[in-house]
Amino acid sequence: ESIPMKSLRCYNDYNSQVTCTWMEHSEAHDLLGMTLYQRNNIIMENKDMFCKRQTEKDLQKTPDAYVHWVCRNTRESFGIGVDFFYGFRPKKVLQAGLDVDLFQNVQPLPPQNLSVSLMTSGDFLLTWKTVDGGQELGNALEFEVTYKREWESWEGAASLLLPSTTHCSLSREGLVPGSSYVARVRARPGQASGFSGHYSEWSTEVSWKTPGGSVEWSGAMQGWMLRSQNFPVPYLAPVLSEGGLQPRNLRCLFTGGDRLTCSWEVKKVITTSVLFGLFFRATPASAEEECSPVHEKTLTHTPYVVQSCEIPVSNSSSQRHYHVSVRAKTEEKHIEAYKNIQVQPPANVSVTATENHEYELSWIKHNLSYSFITQRYQVKYWENNQYEKVTYKVQES
């Protein structure tokens, strides 16, 4: 839930007036601003509520990072069976859209099970497996293998480009004896395959040590190991939107199998007031669907967060063109009027001395929509200027 929806509290006098209070982050208010609306199940029309900003004096509290609101509206009908719904609408339209051709936006999953073994020739054999991305794509991948000594940087690593294979050999003549090496591999659609897109992320690394001098291979290879390391996703050309409010850098990548992963960036402070959703159509005539769940990752040193969602792909050969859009979702809350009554305070309170030296307190009560609903009163009184000595009495009518 957003902060406005989480903080929303609404009550009514069960006669004509509805009052709501809520808050939003002050920076989100300055950038965007939200409008509270109300609807019931009889009229079924959203009606904006009249809202007034509350001051620190109104709240009797110190300033904080939020803007507090009190909103009011009048209604003619209350009762069990009359349902009230409340929601927030941003004062600006927030959305971004993209047409996606699956076969032109491929990013394979990283190769798995990378391993190294010593051949009888003394060369080293690297092998790996591809993750199922569909038979067509699986036969159309090319691979990049990079390897280096452990202490060297990847920028200076040796690189091999290999079309449609899941192994390669490294000649012992090209390796320094008695050195520790590390290798990794990634995949991309082959240039002549009819697919296009981007490299996968790198596989996990594999490490080994070359024999040195008279050292036997069996001893030198003891303890070669696999280790995991995360590598940055290669840069992709962004779809940018004007202004700092709109979702930006919307992009979608197809694994070649059964998933289309879309991601976008939004200002973090705006997400305190608005929840963004990803919506898609597999064909122009199909009904729009919402992708779920949406994941979020914070970016360091930037006011933006990355949100993402995976769209299931059932038949990429017959449905390869998708339209996706990111926009603010509609949040609504059902608040039952008869369970959230706050009666208007009694009017014309007066005190009368009785003949037996007692005092009688009287007032005019606030009428509810239904006369059979009883009201319970709390009377509070004290000696003049002695508020700490308070006495309560409770009475029903």
Regions found by a protein language model. Give the residues of each.
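Pro/Thr/Ser/Gly-rich low-complexity, intrinsically disordered linker/stalk tracts
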Residues: 1-26, 94-137, 197-268, 331-370
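N-terminal Sec-dependent signal peptide, specifically the hydrophobic helical h-region
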Residues: 1-7, 31-36, 45-52, 82-87, ...
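Solvent-exposed loop/turn segments flanking beta-strands in beta-repeat/beta-sandwich domains
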Residues: 6, 25-47, 131-151, 248, ...
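An aromatic-rich alpha-helical recognition segment common to small helix-rich domains
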Residues: 22, 88, 111, 126-128, ...
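Short beta-strand segments within Ig-like beta-sandwich modules, predominantly Fibronectin type-III
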Residues: 51, 59-68, 157-167, 199, ...
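Beta-strand-rich modules
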Residues: 61-99, 168-196, 304-337, 396-397
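Extended repeat-based solenoid scaffolds, especially LRR ectodomains
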Residues: 263-265, 277-330
